[in-house]
């Protein structure tokens, strides 16, 4: 059996090293894609300036100095909405301000991916969905806020929360590259050259930073000891122990670590095991409606 893993952003040497231990040989084959030069420009954000205002100034500068559509990377839908509010009153009439994020309706996402009509320009305010998952045609200018929203385990609650952090150099390079897909482009970075050199090359792997309850429950359903599985990044021992203790407390795993009937029922729900247990245990009583409302509020947050 031959397995070919392809990615534009993977840490190839890490994959090769880990897979070589089990396969004996896992060579890296590099295929250089066609890219064009991208002019990197640094415009540091003032410490006390609101993000949407600094993004607005950068967009106006790019509209004056460069041609083509603009792709702006922001950490979340809240920042996108605020930046849109700033830009709508300050951009010329021939400029379309559109939003792109996974939380938006598909029709709006599809509209954001379509090039503007002849004679018009487009500013796409996007999350990191446009970094690797989607290609926005017609973009020759990228503006990178330099921050990202990533999941992290909250030790106080035992649940995963989203935190805003400084993005990595790898992410910045990937975002800048979006400006040079079809011709020479320009990338504005909202930080300075010195700060650029101090950024992490890569952010820590997500699986090492989040709650592992869902992962542990899924693996228990497979019936395979977790120690027999090969991971690119070693799972934190403390997080894994906490996950198994939590699943046992919820009676989703038995004393031997095997998945229970309740555990399989919870696994079928698209919820964290803690929340799924609330639903499964109260499905047939009078409070299930209240629980559904509580979960809807929690998940909306």
Where are these regions (language model features)?
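Leucine-rich, amphipathic alpha-helical/linker segments
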Residues: 272-301
